[in-house]
């Protein structure tokens, strides 16, 4: 396997808090999937939870070198947790096919937060 891309993003959590306060569900629905929104609302610190997912989506687009343009769309990238609570990325079928056409077979995600910041790193692998 070879590394096909690396992306990193850092988000100032108060920026997400401000967007939630100003735009509410409009902001949530523009950026996040229904599952992400539902999972966030079950949490005490919704903005922190969503900031980490926002950072993950941005890091993924940076790893591809494309930025946020078709087929990379906010809802095409979903951050969820596996059975052990480890974050992982689920892609839409269109985006998965796009990745496969560019020999990207695996994607790895790490998330962290500290005080007012959330950070994500994404590593893309292929042959």
Region roles according to the model:
Residues 1-127:
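Core catalytic alpha/beta fold that binds nucleotide/phospho-ligands
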